Amino acid sequence: YHSNGTIYEKNSFPGGHARSHNDNGFVFDEGIHVLHTKNKYILELLKKIGANLQFRERDAWIVSHGAMTRYPFQANTYGLPTDIVKDCLIGFIENDFTQTDKKKNYQDWTYYMFGKGIAEHFMIPYSKKFWGVDPKLLTTDWVNVRHPRPSLDEVITGAIQDQSKRFGINGNYRYPETYGFGNIAESLENA
């Protein structure tokens, strides 16, 4: 399978930023990596190369406004300061989805999908940090599957109590049993 391809690497090891390193017995992934594909071909390929993936459930948290709340923020404002929760709820409720012509970039899409509170208290600042560019410069063709829009009931529930429902495409994922995400690149190299 694919034995006639050439792979170019900047470093002397495989994986680029999808690698792991060991520091005093602790394994660190170079970046945030989880595998949530449902593509049977990819899953079979990973099995063939011996990537030894485990199925896991996401348990991710966000530190925001001096508190910890579950990921994703848009469905889990419980525990945040009351004024932040109120802004997020009001913004989500007031959002009427009539401004369809104003979704030309990621920032506009964020306001459109989640309302002013969620956009300004989390999505926009986090996007600037994560992507390193102004959200007005990002396109929107990738976001619907990556950023789930919870129902109003889910937003209200997530504001008044801790909810453990997993939203989005990576609520369940696969991750190597040993040596972090870099195990996949090393398995490919040795296949």
Predicted regions and their residues:
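Gly/Ser/Thr-rich beta-alpha loop segments that engage phosphate groups in nucleotides
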Residues: 17-18, 33, 68, 182
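Active-site/ligand-binding neighborhood in enzyme catalytic cores
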Residues: 84-191
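Dinucleotide-binding Rossmann-like beta1-alpha1 core, especially the glycine-rich loop
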Residues: 24-98
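Short glycine/proline-enriched coil/turn segments at helix->beta-strand junctions
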Residues: 1-5, 49-51, 190-191
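Glycine-rich FAD pyrophosphate-binding loop
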Residues: 1-22
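Short, flexible helix/strand-to-coil boundary loops that buttress conserved ligand/catalytic motifs
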Residues: 18-22, 39, 123
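Short, solvent-exposed loop/turn segments at secondary-structure junctions
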Residues: 12-14, 69, 128-129
